[in-house]
Amino acid sequence: MSRFIIRCLVDICALCPTERQLKHSITPTLKHMTYELSYWERESFFKSIDVAVIGSGIVGLAAAIHLKKLDPNLQVAVLERGTLPVGASTRNAGFSCFGSMTELLDDLQQASEDQVLGVVEKRWAGLQRLRALVGDENLDFQMLGGYEMFTEVEESVFRQCLDRMPEFNEKIGRITGWKEGYKVVDDRLANFGFKGIKHLIINQPEGQVNTGKMMSALLARAQEAGVRIFNGFALKSVEDSSQGVELHTAFGWSIRVPRALVCVNGFARQLMQMPEVQPARNQVLITQPVPGLRVEGCFHYDRGYFYFRNLDGRILLGGGRNLDLETEYTDQFGSNERIREALVQLLENVICPGQSIPIDTWWTGIMGLGPVKKPIIERVSPNVTVAVRLSGMGVAIGTLVGQEGAEMCMGYEI
C-alpha cells in the first residue's frame, strides 16, 4: 500500500507544472492580448459616460471629484492603465513643499519675478485645496518644515540666500501669511547628526504627507461622489472627431465619449504626442527602521536634486537625476545603478554617517517636466482637454491643476 501511495505521489508531481512553468502559463502579456468588447460590457459600463478622465493620480482624481461638484448628474469615469496610479502620485516622497530659496533664485534667472511668484502662489493654493479636500488627518499632514542643506563649497550660494532672505520673506509671506518663512537654523545641525553640512535654511510652512493615505482618501472621495474608476484600462491613442472622442485601447477595442480630460503628466508625450512635456525618472529608496533616528522634516541637498525625509522611523531618500540626466529622461521604470550607489553613499556618509543602514526597498517614479514650470492646462481639440506637466510638484499643485482642468473641460473660464 505504501509503495502504491508513493508511486501515485510521484505521478501527481510529474503532472504538476513547476513554479517557473506556472509563471509562464498563468501570466498573460496583457499589452499583447487583444479581444472584442462584449455587448454587455459596452452597454453596462461604457455607454453612459459623459466625461472620461484619463489617469487616476492626484490630478485625475481631483478633476473627477470637481466635475461631480460642478454637475452632480454628470457621469464621470476615471480610466487608469495600472492596478494603482502609474506615474508619480503613489511613488513620490510626500513633500508638501512650494519653493526652496535656491530653487527660486535659479528660477529668477529664467523667468520674471511675477512669473516665479505666480508659480509659488499656485503651489501654495494647491496645497490648501488638497488639505481642504482630503483633510489633514487623512493626509497625515505634518508641518515639520522643509530644509535646504549647504556644504562648505556652497558657502557663496548660502550667502546669496542670506542676502535675499528679508526680501523673500516679505514677498513669499504675502502669499503664505508667514512673516518669517525662511530662517537660518544652523543650531539644529548637531541634533540631526549630519556630516559635512555647514548651514541649514528652513522654509517653516512646508511639511510632509503620507502619499499612500492621501491617494486612498482621494479614491474614497471620488467613489463617494459617484465617480466610476476602471483600472487596467490601457490606452494607445485618443482621437477627437465631430462624433466624440474615440479612446483606442491596447486590447484592440475602443469606446467613444463626449469629452475627455487627459491627466497623465509624465506620459503625455507618449499618449498625446506632446513634446513640451519631458518625462523624467527618479530613483527612490526607503531604509529599514533606523534605531535612534533624529532626522525630522523634509530635506533638500545639492540644489534639490537629492531629497530625503523621515517616515515611520526610517529614511526615505531619492533623486540624483543630475548624475545621469539623459538616461533619466525616460518614461520607462527601471533602476540606474550609478544613481542608486550615489544615494547609498549620501545616506551612509552624510545623513547617517558611520552607520550601515539596511535598505528595505527601491522604486522609481515618472515626472513630467518642461522648459518652464507652469503646468499645461489647455483644450487641445474641441472635446479633449489636457492637465499635465506638474514639474515635480504634484503634491503641491496637483489638486489645483485637476480642478482647473475640470473647469476648462466643461467650458468654464479659468
Positions of predicted regions on the chain:
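A conserved short coil-to-beta-strand element within the FAD-binding core of flavoproteins
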Residues: N231-G244
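Active-site lid/adjacent beta-loop-alpha segment flanking the redox-cofactor pocket in flavoenzymes
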Residues: L293-K374, E378-V380
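Flavin (FAD/FMN) cofactor-binding and adjacent substrate-gating region
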Residues: T102-L108, A132-L144, E148-S216, A225
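Extreme N-terminal leader/targeting segments of oxidoreductases
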Residues: I5-C13, R20-V51, K69
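Glycine-rich FAD pyrophosphate-binding loop
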Residues: D71-R91
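C-terminal catalytic lobe of FAD-dependent flavoproteins
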Residues: S356-I414
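Central helical "cap/lid" subdomain
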Residues: T249-V295
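Conserved FAD-binding subdomain of flavin-dependent enzymes
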Residues: H66, L84-Q142, V157-Q160
